[in-house]
Amino acid sequence: MKKISVMILGAFLMLGASVLSANSQNLQIFSVDNAKGTINAKTVQKAFGDVGVIVDVNNDMNSIFSKRYGSVHHKKYNLAIFTNETIVKKLMNKYPSIGMITPLTMSIYSGADKSINISTLSLAGMARITKIPATNADLIAYSKLVDAALHKALPNGKYLSVNHALNTNKELVTEFTTEFELEDGDTYIDVKNGFKEEFESEISPVGFLVPKSYTYEHDAYDFFDTYSIIRFNAIYPVSKNHPDAGAYAPFSVVIYKKKGDETVHIAYPSISNWIDDLDIKEEATINAVRETQDMMKDILEELTE
């Protein structure tokens, strides 16, 4: 019989200012003048790759939005996902929660002042979601690598002042646990793949897409997979007044099982966090975000019963 326990983790991670430098905000926006138009999503992708940050998906959202909704909010708007497998695997040794920000995400967008901007999670934001200490050397290295990529992508750029809310009463993470039953001849990989197929068949009809999934091999795990997931009906209204939402979207669902442990863990950063983290005030947009959180939570509750 499958066993399930659903745990909503809501504690805010206390972070020392001394290890977070000047930026204790959960997201960061790096910006530079682009009046000549020489910088674009493709040049950003190449620059990230040059420093060892691999951009696996880099979507022109305006193309999607114009076809689906008939209008766009920004002259240029891309959502991209990126990783550094070496650092991710190091963090997996002790912190499977790294899967909740694997891949990392960014929005690449034009400003009204002819600037180009990139929004990503800061070190504080990475630590907050994963509960990996902000003093962890590998997490710091990851943050520094992102910083190097941003400077490479936007020469002479600078970080903009961000004053979003730091505290929230909402759950930071939505997490489930269950057990997989093995039938004759099955492996845990077989059952996990079956779960993945069922999961995707449930989320697709209600507007969720999986731009990319990752399978990591690691000696400590029977399996460790992450799914990068997006729902256009959420990101479209959010991005109108909050283009920096790309630091959170697409969001990642991690599913893993440690060797010697019967428990299968499934978790993702709660989508409802966007409301406070991005200072969303528009009622219709808030409703779209809450609907997206509830839909994903309900689907995973059903699948893990």
Description of each model-found segment:
Residues M1-I8:
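Bacterial N-terminal signal peptides that target proteins for export
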Residues I29-A35, Y77, R128-A137, F180-D186, ...:
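Second-shell loop/turn segments in exported
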Residues H74-G99, P211-H242, G246-Y248:
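Compact, glycine-rich, soluble single-domain proteins
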Residues A112-A137, V254-E305:
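A short, solvent-exposed beta-edge/loop patch
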Residues T130-L166:
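Contiguous hydrophobic, core-forming segments of folded domains
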